[in-house]
Amino acid sequence: MASTPQIAVVDYDMGNLHSACKGLEAAGANPIVTADPATILAADGVLLPGVGAFDPAMDHLRDRQLIEPLHQAATSGKPFLGICLGLQLLFEASEEGQSAGLGILPGRVQRFRSEPGLVIPHMGWNQLQLQQPDCPLWQNLGADPWFYFVHTYYVVPSEPTLTAATVQHGSQPVTAAIARDRLWAVQFHPEKSAKAGLQLLANFVTQVAAAQLQTVA
């Protein structure tokens, strides 16, 4: 019988981790807040959260020698979830700064274009348009669920098949989530998205537990 899923929550001083940890705990996981590469690589799953600016985030990851461990974790088949800035960092670069991103996924991060009547940042609840309806993150959420967003930049994947959900902000379609194998990432904040957010975190924990069972078997 597999033990409680251990999920490394990467701590690089770019956001409050408490709410996400509570959501993981509620779903039956043991979140481990850590900046230790060995702990990240040994965990059953990894959560990369983050709020703030792209360049300082990459600097913090580099200072903690987390670039290579995150590459390994995200490409190993281990369940991996990025949230908000944690989504953007997975890509190659951002209009917000000069630093290269992690480059795990192809594409760039760009700023919303100004248009009449459009409020930037995109802040508040928005309804997803699911591009990968069978993505495990959407289980038990119903069609086109609502989530809470706060962001000025968004990812533009070079491979359209990466996109798992979009939203509309003004006239601009926005990538709200990506999925490839067991690598998932979302622009919205599950930890601020009430029942839907808790369900999404529970879905991630379910995937971590399933992968853990496969490893044990």
Curated annotation (Swiss-Prot):
InterPro entries: Class_I_gatase-like, GATASE, Imidazole-glycPsynth_HisH. The gene is hisH. Heterodimer of HisH and HisF. GO terms for biological process: L-histidine biosynthetic process. Keywords: Amino-acid biosynthesis, Cytoplasm, Glutamine amidotransferase, Histidine biosynthesis, Hydrolase, Lyase. The lineage of its organism: Bacteria, Bacillati, Cyanobacteriota, Cyanophyceae, Synechococcales. Residues 6-214 form the Glutamine amidotransferase type-1 domain. Pathway: Amino-acid biosynthesis; L-histidine biosynthesis; L-histidine from 5-phospho-alpha-D-ribose 1-diphosphate: step 5/9. It comes from Synechococcus elongatus (strain ATCC 33912 / PCC 7942 / FACHB-805) (Anacystis nidulans R2). This is Imidazole glycerol phosphate synthase subunit HisH. GO terms for molecular function: glutaminase activity; imidazoleglycerol-phosphate synthase activity; lyase activity.
